[in-house]
Amino acid sequence: VSINRLYADTIQQSPEFQIIEELLYEECENIIDLSKKLFLSPSKTQRNLKKIESVLLKTGITLQYRPLRLEGNESVIRHMYYRYFIEKSDRLDSLYRDLKEFQIKAITELVNQFIQVNKLEDNYISRKRLGYNMYISLWRIKNGHYYPTLELDSDLMLPERQILDA
């Protein structure tokens, strides 16, 4: 077992890290739902949420309790999740929670096309970073958290629609 795998497994067992991940998916309406999902007592869940909340507040991220979700600067939230998944996982495919094969293929193809259209360096690190960021962005968008239009100014291009539909 590699040290990276040991570290990733340790993080995955941490209640605080499990809570942070659950907050991305926004599937728990309240503390009781979250505690049941993670097999923690409601009081331990609440203590962990308070601990997480105090750290998040320093970055301008707020924890909403009903429903449980993170709000604040969208770029900071997405970057936090990127850093979280980098620490948690040593393999890209272990990231994709509850995704079907065709969805994983779609993300992979979008990454491929994005690299090609923008003439980016095509290596494992670039693919991993883009894959993680697309996965996180899709979940955030699914839950109604959009990137502010004014912050979307970039020279990067998206692949043509017909290429994506193929």
Name each model feature, range by range.
Residues V1-A166:
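A cross-family "folded-core" feature that marks the main globular domain of proteins
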